[in-house]
């Protein structure tokens, strides 16, 4: 379950931001997660409950902004939306796609006290 290590990284980033900016409590964490990032949402929710326990973000609301998968098709030259890495081009049926977005994951912002 790599979601635990993802949330551990988020906890570290929150702690570093708290030290740098002087806040004591996080009430909301907004994340941008691409559909191609390979993150299981139920496992991520569980990891947040476990990893953030006892931290300044314990009990914070977690909002996930879903980013679509995007790929460039070498066959028709279009940029298309995809759901999975091995999808075919919805425009031409081509199989030579290069992922260009939707595999990212980042903290968009924090609501703090």
Curated annotation (Swiss-Prot):
Binding annotation for Zn(2+): 73, 76, 89, 92
Residues holding Ni(2+): 2
UniProt keyword Transport present: no
Pfam family, one: HypA
GO biological process: protein maturation; protein modification process
Source organism superkingdom: Bacteria
GO molecular function, one term: nickel cation binding
Regions crossing the membrane: none
InterPro entries: Hydgase_Ni_incorp_HypA/HybF_CS, HypA/HybF
PROSITE patterns noted in UniProt: HYPA
Keyword Protein biosynthesis: no
Keywords: Metal-binding, Nickel, Zinc
Residues forming coiled coils: none
Function recorded in the entry: Involved in the maturation of [NiFe] hydrogenases. Required for nickel insertion into the metal center of the hydrogenase.
Similarity-based family: Belongs to the HypA/HybF family.
Protein name as annotated: Hydrogenase maturation factor HypA
Organism: Rhodobacter capsulatus
